[in-house]
Structures are given as C-alpha cells and as structure tokens.
From Swiss-Prot:
InterPro entries: bZIP, bZIP_sf. Transmembrane segments: none annotated. It comes from Schizosaccharomyces pombe (strain 972 / ATCC 24843) (Fission yeast). Residues 150-165 have a biased composition (Low complexity). Interacts with pof1. Keywords: Cadmium, DNA-binding, Nucleus, Transcription, Transcription regulation. GO terms for molecular function: DNA-binding transcription activator activity, RNA polymerase II-specific; RNA polymerase II cis-regulatory region sequence-specific DNA binding; RNA polymerase II transcription regulatory region sequence-specific DNA binding. This is Transcription factor zip1. Residues 292-320 are annotated as: Leucine-zipper.
C-alpha cells in the first residue's frame, strides 16, 4: 500500500454528514499531521492532541456553541486531574487499536515504519457512528419482515408449481396407456380391452383364458426367427428401361438438345480442322511444283549450254583432223 501523504489524503477524503471534509484544511497541514504515522515511536505520542479538532470522526459543533466550548476549556484548566485521566483513557484506546495489527505482523521494531500497512485501520468504522434511533430500528425490522414474507411466498409458489406438475404427470400417466404393455399383450395373445360400443356383445360371451403354445413363446422370445431370410437371387435391381421410362419427357428433350448442341460443336471443330489441313497440303503442293519448274528450267538451260559446247568441240576436232592429214600424205 502506497503510504505517501498525498495518497493518504486522497484515501481520507470521505464525506459524512456534519463532518468536516479534507478540502476544508490545507494539504500542507494534513501532510504534517500524517507524517506522524511514519514515526516508529508513534505509540508514545498523543495523536488526539496533535491533530486538529473536529477531525477523525469528532462532530464539528456549530458556531453558536463557541461559548460552551470556552466554558468547557475553563473547566478543564481548573481540573487538571480529570484531564490526565481522560488522556490516559485515550492513550489506552489508541494502543488497543494499533496493537492488534502489530501483533499479527510481528515486532514493531523489526517492521519498516514507512511500509506499515494501515489497512487494519478501518477509517470508515472509526468515522461512522452507529445510529441507535428508534426509527432506524423500525425500518430495519420492517425490511426484514418484508423480505421474509417475499421469500415465503416464493417458496410456496414453487411448491405449488411442483405439486401441480407432479399431479399432471400422474394423471397423464393414468390416462395414456403404456406402449410396452400394449406390445406385450399383442405378442403374448391377450384379449384386447373392450370398448363401450362392443361391451354388450362381449359381456354375453364367456371369458376364456388365452392358450399360449410353445411356438408362441418361441416367437415372443425370438421375434427374428419368424421372418424368413429373403433370397438374394430373387431381389433384382431396377433395369435401365424402367429407369428411362420413369423419366419425364422434359428431361429427355433437354438431354437431346444438349447432346445435339455438343454434336454440332464437335462437327464444326472437325470441319475447321479439315479445311486447315487441306489448305496446308495445297500450299505445300504448290511450293513443290514451283521448285520442280525451277529445276526443269535450270536443267534445260544447262542442256543447251552443253549442246553448244559439244558442237564447238566437234568443230575443233574436225579442224584438227584436217590439219593432220596433209602432213601425213608427205
């Protein structure tokens, strides 16, 4: 607990009827007065004589009673023995208030005086005075009586609700038949309860006890034995034709439209692919033809050149032969 003078002033800033507030005093005076609590020898002092009058729960007197205060002071000056006895009583009260927390925490000498926790001092209890007037006692007694009446009414209403619910549940259980009992009657073979319409005819007939056979008892104990196991071969799955027949014509028309649209789209894609492939083939064919034509022209030109060369060579050969023959004749 932070025990600084300012924080202590804020904690002590309590408002009560006919009691002075800390705002009426200067903060410096209060700080000086509260610094006394940090003194380790606080118990040897008299805080009641050091603090101002009308503080710490002492009711301030009105201005008209100043003369009476002066008279009391004069009486105290005349009787110093009474004053000393009163001071001793005050010291004992202060020591009793401070001794309980100190004994709980430990020795006063070992504790740090600055960190003493004054939470043990309930200032509100010291400042508030108990009101023993008849009016307050009557109010509290009337409030207690009202609270007791309300609690008794609430408990009685709860008991009534619970009892009514229990009665309703018992009546409904009596009115409604038990399903398990009914099933037991059906399985064992007991006679059904006669209705009001058929009561006359049933009363005329003599009652007979039901004859329970060994087979009925076995059927009741093992109800699954009465049912025959179905043949798996006889169980046939529904055929596609029945499934198609169960379909509505609107669904068939929608499906045909969807399939036709898909087919048209596929056919268009095929046509586009075929046209593109044929165009590519034609272009390649034209290129090959152009190349063949070029090669043919080049070859024809070469053939013509070679033919002219051959002719020239033949002429030279003949001319050389003519030159050689006359020389050979000689």
């Amino acid at each position: 607990m932070d025990f600084t003078p300012n924080s202590a002033i804020n904690h002590l800033n309590l408002k009560f009827d006919d009691v002075p507030v800390s705002d009426d005093f200067s903060k410096d005076d209060l700080a000086e007065q509260l610094n006394v609590f940090t003194n380790p020898y606080f118990l040897d002092l008299e805080p009641s004589s050091m603090l101002s009058e009308g503080y710490y729960g002492f009711v301030s007197q009105p201005s008209g009673s100043s003369n009476s205060n002066k008279q009391e002071k004069n009486v105290q000056q005349q009787n110093p023995e009474k004053i000393s006895t009163l001071q001793q009583v005050k010291e004992e009260e202060v020591s009793n208030t401070f001794s309980a927390p100190l004994n709980a925490t430990g020795n006063f000498s070992s504790a740090n005086p600055a960190s003493i926790d004054l939470a043990y001092l309930d200032l509100q209890k010291l400042l508030t005075l108990p009101d023993h007037s008849k009016e307050t006692q009557e109010k509290t007694s009337s409030q207690r009586e009202l609270f007791e009446q309300k609690s008794s009414v609430a408990s009685a209403s709860k008991d009534n609700v619970s009892s009514s619910s229990i009665l309703q549940g018992s009546a409904s259980s009596k009115l409604l038949p038990d399903q398990s009992a009914r099933q037991h009657q059906v399985l064992v073979g007991q006679t059904a309860i006669p209705t009001s319409e058929a009561s006359s005819s049933i009363n005329n007939t003599p009652l007979q006890a039901p004859v329970s056979s060994f087979a009925d008892q076995n059927a009741f104990t093992n109800p699954l034995s009465t049912f025959a196991s179905p043949d798996l071969a006889s169980v046939s799955s529904p055929s596609l034709s029945s499934y198609k027949g169960a379909q509505s014509p609107n669904a068939n028309s929608k499906r045909t439209k969807a399939t036709s649209a898909i087919r048209t789209a596929a056919e268009e894609d095929k046509r586009r692919r075929n046209t593109a492939a044929s165009a590519r083939f034609r272009i390649k064919k034209k290129l090959k033809e152009q190349q063949l034509e070029r090669t043919a022209k080049e070859l024809t030109e070469k053939v013509a050149i070679l033919e002219t060369r051959v002719r020239e060579l033949e002429m030279e050969n003949n001319w050389l032969k003519g030159l050689i023959r006359p020389t050979s004749n000689f």
